[in-house]
């Protein structure tokens, strides 16, 4: 059996047993999603790359402590999110610090929902603009709310799995999502974007928080 033929748990066990290729294969399988979580949680590529590196070092060293009471992917995401939150706390990042320097180009000055009647953007341009505004607003949320929304709304994980990743109760995840969505909705109204919310704390329709078009994977 080759390294590529093994499932995640077998790769992790092989890594613990000394297989030099196993962890690299495991990371390669989940690289894009782990990077997406880090990028959306941190708000910029440089900090996301640092947080992901912290997480991978931690996972590499702590693989022997994996108890098997969750999926390996859940365990990896939990380590990545914790690394992001630790770095945010260490850097004392304020809510607005993760906003891009060119935010005004994304959301404009004052009211932003007016579209020129002379030159109407095509659907792709409108979708890109909307996505940028959502991600900019997301970056202003408190770290715990941001992490919950990234995992539930953008990555599509069930609330129960996110509770494991964040090491908190299911009700806490739902509460963080609900508070985050309310704050996000208020910001998006200012930005001229309609935000869909749900009452039960579970994932809203995909259009509510669109995926990022940022390059996949951490910078090489």
Task: Identify the meaning behind each predicted range.
Residues 2-3, 16-25, 35-54:
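Short, charged helix-capping/linker segments at alpha-helix termini
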């Amino acid at each position: 059996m080759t390294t590529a033929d093994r499932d995640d748990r077998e790769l992790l066990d092989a890594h613990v047993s000394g297989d030099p290729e196993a962890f690299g294969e495991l990371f390669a399988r989940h690289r894009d999603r782990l990077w997406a979580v880090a990028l959306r949680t941190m708000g910029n590529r440089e900090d996301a790359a640092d947080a992901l590196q912290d997480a991978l070092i931690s996972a590499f060293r702590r693989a022997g402590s994996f108890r098997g009471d969750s999926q390996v992917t859940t365990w990896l995401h939990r380590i990545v999110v914790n690394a992001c939150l630790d770095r945010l706390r260490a850097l004392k990042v304020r809510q607005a610090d993760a906003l891009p320097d060119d935010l005004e180009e994304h959301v404009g000055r004052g009211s932003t929902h007016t579209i020129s009647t002379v030159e109407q953007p095509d659907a792709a341009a409108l979708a890109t603009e909307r996505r940028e505004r959502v991600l900019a607003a997301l970056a202003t949320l408190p770290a715990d709310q941001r992490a919950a929304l990234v995992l539930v709304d953008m990555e599509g994980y069930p609330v129960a799995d996110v509770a494991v990743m964040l090491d908190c109760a299911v009700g806490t995840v739902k509460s963080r999502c609900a508070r985050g969505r309310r704050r996000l909705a208020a910001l998006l109204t200012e930005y001229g974007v309609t935000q869909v919310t749900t009452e039960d704390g579970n994932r809203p329709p995909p259009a509510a928080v669109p995926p990022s078009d940022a390059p996949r994977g951490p910078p090489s």
